[in-house]
Swiss-Prot record:
Keyword Manganese carried by entry: no
One of the protein's GO biological processes: B cell receptor signaling pathway
A GO CC term assigned to this protein in UniProt: cytosol
Pfam families in alphabetical order: SH2
Acidic residues: compositionally biased ranges: 77-93, 188-205
Tissues showing expression: Highly expressed in the bursa, very low expression in ovary and spleen. Expression was variable among B-cell lines. Highly expressed in immature B-cell lines such as DT40 and CL18, low expression was seen in relatively mature B-cell lines, such as 293B9 and 249L4. No expression was seen in T-cell lines.
Listed name of the protein: B-cell linker protein
SMART domains: SH2 (SM00252)
Biased composition (Basic and acidic residues): 67-76, 277-295, 309-322, 368-382
Location, primary (coarse class): cytoplasm
Length: 552
C-alpha cells in the first residue's frame, strides 16, 4: 500500500500540473480571442459611425447658398459675415437668420425688392419680344401693319425715340443697384402693356415699332415699279389691307388704259405662244410618229456592226470571222440600241426637218434590207418582203421588230458548239490546229460540261480524261481538261497566255508550267502525275492521264 501511495502522489501532482497548464493555455487563448474580437468590434463601430456620417452628408444635402445680390445692403454684409463664421459647423442656423433678415427687412422698405431679378429678366424679354413681333408675325398681323402706316408718316421721329427708351431701364439695372427698386414698381403695374419706361401716351409710339416701318415699305417697292402708281398709292393705304388689295387690282387696269402699248405687248404674245406651242406639239408628235425614228433606230446598228468586228478580227485575224461577226452581231445592237437613241434623234431631227420625211426612210430601209439577208442565212429569207412597206404605213410595227431580234442571238451562240456553219467550222479548225487538238482522240469538239461528266462517270476509271471547249467561250480560257479520279470529276481550265502564245493549267501562279500547245499538256501529264485539288473538301490527289474517253 505504501508503494502504491508513493506512486499515486506524484502521479496526482503531475495530473494537477497538467490541468493547470491546460487551464492557463485556455485562459491565454481566450484573452487573445477577446482582444481580437474587441478590436474588431471597435473597428466595425468606427466604420459604422463614419459610414453613417458620410451617408448623412450624402443624404441630407446642405441648403444651397444664396446668389450674390445686384444691390448693396447693410444686412447683406452682416449675413456674409454670419456665413463665414458658421459655415463650417451648421447650415441651418445661418439660413434661418439670413431668411429672416433677407425677406423681412426689404419687404418693410420695398416689397418689390425681393422680386427685382424677375422684372430685370422680363425687361430683357421685352426687347426681343418687340422685334420678333415685327419679324415673325408679319404674316398674321398684316392688317394691323397696313392700318398703322398713316400714323407713321406724321410721326417719323417718335419711333426712333421710343426704341432707346426701353433700353435705358435694362442697362442701368446692373449698374445702379440701390435706385432700381423704385422703377420695377411701374414695371410690375404695366407689364401687360409693355409701357414701362414711357408715359401713357407711348402706346402710339410702341405700336409703330411693333409694326416696323420696313414691312409697309416693302409692298410699295413692288408697286413703284411703274411711275403712274406713285400718285395713287400714298392715299389708299389708310383704311385697311382689303382696300390696299383692291387698289392693287385697280391700278393695273388704270395703267392699261393709260398705256395701251404694253397691254398689246402682253396680249399679242399670249395667243401667239399658244399657237406656237400647239404647232410645236403637233410637230413633235408628227416627228415621233414619223418613220424618222425608224430610220434612226435602223441606222444605229450600222456603226456597232463596224465596231464589234474589229475586236473579233484582232482576236482571230480571219476575214471569214469578220464576216461572221457582222452577221451574228447585227442582231445584238437593237437590244442595246435604246441607250443611244436620243443622240440619234437629235441628229436626225436637225438634219431631216428641211427635207421630206419619206426620203430618209427609203434610204435607211434599203440598208435594213441588207441586214435580213445576212441574218436570213440562218433563219430564211421570208422576212425580206414585209419590211419596206411597213415603215411608211405603220411605223409602230417596224419599232417592234428590232425588239424581237435580241432573242434570236441565243441560238447562234449555242450553235457555235453544236451546229457550226462553214465559217464557224473554219474558225474553230484554225484555232484547234493552233492549239494542237484538231482531230485528236481525246478532244470532244461538240461536247458540253454535262455530257463530258456523264461520259467520265460511265467510264468509272481513275485517270480517264478528255478535253472539251469551255462553256464560257472565252479566248483566254478556250479549253477545259476533264479528269475522273476517285469517283469525282475535276474540270481544270486551260488558259491561253496571249503575251507568249502559250497554254497553262488552272489559275495563274508563279513558277507554273507553260506549254506551246494543248497536245503538249496531255503528253506531259500522261507521263507525270497531275495534281487534283478539291476546294470543297480541301483535299489533294494526283493521277496521270491514262484512259481516253470519247463522247458519242
Amino acid at each position: 500500500m505504501d508503494k502504491l501511495n508513493k506512486l499515486a502522489v506524484p502521479a496526482g501532482e503531475k495530473f494537477r500540473k497538467l490541468q493547470k497548464m491546460v487551464h492557463d493555455i485556455k485562459k491565454n487563448e481566450s484573452g487573445i480571442i477577446n482582444k481580437f474580437k474587441k478590436f474588431q468590434n471597435e473597428q466595425v463601430a468606427l466604420i459604422c459611425k463614419t459610414g453613417k456620417d458620410t451617408w448623412d452628408r450624402l443624404k441630407k444635402k446642405p441648403p444651397p447658398s444664396l446668389p450674390r445680390r445686384d444691390y448693396a445692403s447693410e444686412h447683406a454684409d452682416n449675413e456674409e459675415e454670419q456665413w463665414s463664421d458658421d459655415f463650417d459647423s451648421d447650415y441651418e442656423n445661418p439660413d434661418g437668420h439670413s431668411d429672416s433678415e433677407m425677406y423681412v427687412v426689404p419687404s418693410e422698405e420695398n416689397p418689390d425688392d425681393s422680386y427685382e431679378p424677375p422684372p430685370s429678366e422680363q425687361e430683357k424679354k421685352k426687347i426681343p419680344s418687340s422685334f420678333p413681333i415685327s419679324r415673325g408675325e408679319y404674316a398674321d398681323n398684316r392688317t394691323s401693319h397696313h392700318q398703322l402706316p398713316p400714323i407713321n408718316k406724321p410721326l417719323p421721329s417718335t419711333p426712333s425715340s421710343a426704341l432707346p427708351r426701353p433700353k435705358k431701364p435694362s442697362l442701368p439695372s446692373p449698374a445702379a443697384k440701390p435706385k432700381l427698386p423704385l422703377k420695377p414698381r411701374e414695371c410690375s403695374d404695366d407689364e401687360d402693356n409693355y409701357i414701362v419706361p414711357v408715359d401713357n401716351d407711348d402706346d402710339n409710339y410702341i405700336e409703330p415699332t411693333e409694326s416696323s416701318t420696313p414691312p409697309p415699305a416693302k409692298p410699295p417697292v413692288n408697286r413703284f415699279m411703274k411711275p403712274p402708281a406713285k400718285s395713287a398709292l400714298p392715299t389708299p393705304p389708310k383704311p385697311s389691307l382689303a382696300s390696299d388689295m383692291q387698289e392693287v387690282y385697280e391700278v393695273p387696269e388704270e395703267e392699261e388704259e393709260l398705256s395701251p402699248p404694253p397691254v398689246t405687248r402682253f396680249t399679242k404674245p399670249l395667243p401667239a405662244t399658244r399657237a406656237q406651242n400647239a404647232e410645236h406639239s403637233h410637230m413633235h408628235s408628227m416627228t415621233r410618229e414619223s418613220p424618222k425614228l425608224d430610220a434612226s433606230r435602223n441606222i444605229l446598228p450600222l456603226p456597232r456592226n463596224r465596231l464589234h468586228p474589229k475586236t473579233d478580227h484582232e482576236a482571230n485575224n480571219n476575214d471569214e470571222n469578220h464576216s461572221f461577226s457582222n452577221t451574228q452581231e447585227s442582231k445584238f445592237p437593237p437590244g442595246a440600241a435604246p441607250s443611244p437613241l436620243p443622240r440619234a434623234l437629235k441628229k436626225t431631227s436637225n438634219a431631216v426637218n428641211p427635207a421630206k420625211p419619206c426620203l430618209p426612210s427609203r434610204d435607211t430601209f434599203t440598208v435594213n434590207e441588207d441586214k435580213p439577208t445576212a441574218a436570213d442565212r440562218r433563219r430564211g429569207s421570208s422576212h425580206e418582203f414585209p419590211l419596206p412597206p411597213l415603215p411608211s404605213g405603220t411605223p409602230k410595227s417596224s419599232l417592234q421588230k428590232p425588239l424581237v431580234l435580241p432573242k434570236v442571238p441565243e441560238a447562234p451562240s449555242r450553235a457555235l458548239g453544236t451546229s457550226p456553219h462553214s465559217s464557224i467550222s473554219s474558225i474553230s479548225s484554225t484555232a484547234d490546229q493552233d492549239a494542237g487538238v484538231h482531230s485528236k482522240a481525246w478532244y470532244a469538239a461538240t461536247c458540253d460540261r454535262k455530257t463530258a461528266e456523264d461520259a467520265l462517270y460511265r467510264s468509272n476509271k481513275d485517270g480517264s480524261f478528255l478535253i472539251r471547249k469551255s462553256s464560257g467561250q472565252d479566248s483566254r480560257q478556250p479549253y477545259t481538261l476533264v479528269v475522273f479520279y476517285n469517283r469525282r470529276v475535276y474540270n481544270i481550265p486551260i488558259r491561253f497566255i496571249e503575251s507568249t502564245r502559250q497554254y497553262a493549267l488552272g489559275r495563274e501562279k508563279c513558277g507554273e508550267e507553260r506549254f506551246d500547245s494543248v497536245a503538249e499538256i496531255v503528253e506531259n501529264h500522261q507521263h507525270t502525275s497531275l495534281v487534283l485539288i478539291d476546294s470543297q473538301n480541301n483535299t489533294k490527289d494526283s493521277t496521270k492521264l491514262k484512259y481516253i474517253v470519247r463522247v458519242s
